Amino acid sequence: MKQNLISSVQIILLLPLTTVGLTSQSFPGKPKIIRCRSLEKETFSCWWKPGSDGGLPTNYTLFYSKDSEEKIYECPDYRTSGPNSCYFNRNYTNSWTTYNITVTATNEIGSNSSDPQYVDVTSIVQPGSPVNLTLETQRYANIMYLWAKWSPPLLADASSNHLYHYELRLKPEEKEEWETVPVGVQTQCKINRLNAGMRYVVQVRCMLDPGEWSEWSSERRILISGGLSPPEKPTITKCRSPEKETFTCWWKPGLDGGHPTNYTLLYSKEGEEQVYECPDYRTAGPNSCYFDKKHTSFWTVYNITVKATNEMGSNSSDPHYVDVTYIVQPDPPANVTLELKKPINRKPYLMLTWSPPPLADVRSGWLTLDYELRLKPEEGEEWETVFVGQQTQYKMFSLNPGKKYIVQIHCKPDHHGSWSEWSSENYIEIPNDFRVKDMIVWIVLGVLSSLICLIMSWTMVLKGYRMITFILPPVPGPKIKGIDTHLLETGKSEELLSALGCHGFPPTSDCEELLIEYLEVEDSEDHQLMPSHDSGRPSKNAKITLKETDRDSGRGSCDSPSLLSEKCRETCALPSALQIQDVRDVQAKKAGKRSWESYCVASERKALLFNNESAKSSTWPAVQLPNNQPPTFAYHSIVEANKITSTTTNMNVAAVLVENEERHQSLYSISETISGGMEKQEEMENLHSKTTQTTVQVRQNRSNEKLPFLNAALMDYVEVHKVRQDEEPTVLLKHKEKSGKIEKYTISGASKEYTKVSTVMNHNILVLMPDSRVLHTPTSQEEPAKETSQNPQQGQVETNMSYCMTAPRDCQREPSGSEYMDPSSFMPSFK
């Protein structure tokens, strides 16, 4: 238990450290005091070196206390001596006091202090270097002497009683060893025993007693000549134009020959013989000549020489030819600024901005400058150079956080000229927090990805099968009992359907051929249909017209298997239908002018009514009848017919015409006028002899009165009973009463066996085809038609509905086996 408690405490304590480690933000590093120095024993300064800032802004504070006091004071001045320093003026300086000094670094997380530094002002005195060092040679008694003179440090107070001790060192210019000469408190020194004809380098330093030596002064050089001689030839070092409007030339003097020497610059212009002297020796510094705008010609070549003269003679430099266009070297860019930008949702970058050189006339376009920058880490040695072009700003990306960079910029003219000097160094430090944020994001993403992978692996191990089943569910098998899966896989649909007790698919090639709207035939004298109760003369002019076929494959012609099977067995025959325009004329003409026999059976008190609003879609082609008659419908069973008759209150009598189309049906329209002679009769007989069917036409006169409901017994002939195969195929209709007996219709003592339905015509006419052999053979099977019972509420119905049966002389059929048809479209019932 104790071990668990200890481990928990350790984890809790390590959490802040882990957080600090992940974010790379920590306490500041320990600063270090480098040195403390007093220039004249009256003031002093201390400098320190900062440690790491811990990734956060850090403040540095210097605290001190005196040996005789316990009170702690803060630095009085952080600016005078520069960055990371503290300056103590005379008010805060005591020469006989020891100071205990520490530096504290503080950031948001914490603070850190340097080691204490004990300072006694008398022991840290280090004056500045002497200034104004001059060298001069003098000859005394043919001996050459060197006189060196200087001044005390600049901060030394002349009114003070401090005494400086000086020390001088010199060496030949070609050697490395220095010769040191103590001077004392004097500010000049005379040196002899020098080698004539050699150049020497001289430096001076000083100290206070007690204290430390100052830094050496700057170097001064002098040539010790062996005797009196003219000066050496000077050398022109360079000529430069900063803005392509003025220029300056510099030279390097030679040996002066032991005498003071004067230098003069002379020049002449191309194409002129006149010689001019330098207009200004002071503006550009010593050993130089400045040409202002008045003395500068942009398209002129200058021939320049420098002449050195002393008491012993003179000497001139080599001529130097100058064209201002090619000596342009602008000044370094000014106002260089470095700024670290922190855009939202983007990485930080360093923005560098600068200004063109002050003397360059860039706005007017007289001078166009290109810029180049370089940067490196403070501790690095190699510079990274970037060409910027003519813009005065640049964005630096991909800088390493936590490092301090040095940046410099220079420029040059876009055409002729040279690069300027590099600008002064600019420093900027890139904080660590940007890289830390990126690291945190990647660490979090890595941890989350690892957790997700572990969870998915664990889930797959424990519930792999369920996951696979959920992602890839199994294909379900057939659930119908009795299906042979082998037949289903092999694709034998016919055997599969036969196993299920379903009929095979009907041939698709004949569906359209079985469809026809209606066939109108107008017969004249020899070809006529007789109504049941009226007689008359047929019209002298009749037309035989074949209308356009309805090719709706969804009609009943495609649904009836009997028609399909019969159609496949029949030969090509021309379908025909007869339409009687005048029934009375046909009856009058019947006696001696036509060879066809017509038998009409009158049916009284029996009608079929159909309502347009409640009618269903027929399985036979719906015909648009003339005089805006509604389309007729057919059904496959008495039950459906009973549904129609039991749900309609307003129905009209309609006739259904069923047509047996030819296998190769053609769309054509024939119009013929029958005059009444024997030639027309023979033509009609030949036309009908080409077909294998005899039509029976049933016409029902329409009534304007609304009829009541019909009894279901009216529709009793709805299917085929049997097919005779004795001599020629014959179809017998089946009566669907309870007695189950077969009824045959006879007219004038002749039994009629209906072979098939031919077609459905307009004007409510049903056409059937009888057997030709029965027309000439009497039969004893004639029975009167049974009348169906009428509904007592039924209204008055027209009784002039007739069924006319005609047969051509020669109606040949091919004995093609058992043929039957489904006359489910027989809407009226027969007596």
UniProtKB/Swiss-Prot annotation:
* Topological category with respect to the lipid bilayer: Single-pass type I membrane protein
Q: Where is the signal peptide?
A: 1-23
- InterPro entries according to UniProt: FN3_dom, FN3_sf, Growth/epo_recpt_lig-bind, Ig-like_fold, Long_hematopoietin_rcpt_CS, Type-I_Cytokine_Rcpt
- Provide the binding site for Zn(2+): D414, H416
Q: Which residues lie on this side of the membrane: Cytoplasmic?
A: 460-831
Sites carrying a glycan are: N59, N91, N100, N112, N132, N262, N303, N315, N335
Predominant location: membrane
Which Gene Ontology cellular component annotation is one that this UniProt entry carries?
Answer: receptor complex
UniProt keywords, alphabetically: Disulfide bond, Glycoprotein, Membrane, Metal-binding, Receptor, Repeat, Signal, Transmembrane, Transmembrane helix, Zinc
Query: Which residue ranges have biased composition labelled Polar residues?
Result: 777-803
- Which stretches are tagged as biased composition: Basic and acidic residues? 545-554
Q: Where is this motif: Box 1 motif?
A: 471-479
GO terms, biological process: positive regulation of cell population proliferation
What are the boundaries of the region Disordered?
A: 527-563, 776-831
Q: Does the keyword Membrane apply?
A: yes
Transmembrane residues, as ranges?
A: 439-459
- Return the motif ranges for WSXWS motif: 419-423
Entry GO MF terms: cytokine binding; metal ion binding; peptide hormone binding; prolactin receptor activity
Domain named Fibronectin type-III is located at 30-128, 129-232, 233-331, 332-433
- What are the subcellular locations of this protein? Membrane
- Extracellular domain ranges by topology: 24-438
Q: List the disulfide bonds.
A: C36-C46, C75-C86
Q: What does this protein do?
A: This is a receptor for the anterior pituitary hormone prolactin.
Q: What is known of its domains?
A: The WSXWS motif appears to be necessary for proper protein folding and thereby efficient intracellular transport and cell-surface receptor binding.
Assigned protein family = Belongs to the type I cytokine receptor family. Type 1 subfamily.
Q: What is the protein name for this chain?
A: Prolactin receptor
Q: Which organism is it from?
A: Meleagris gallopavo
- Gene encoding this chain? PRLR
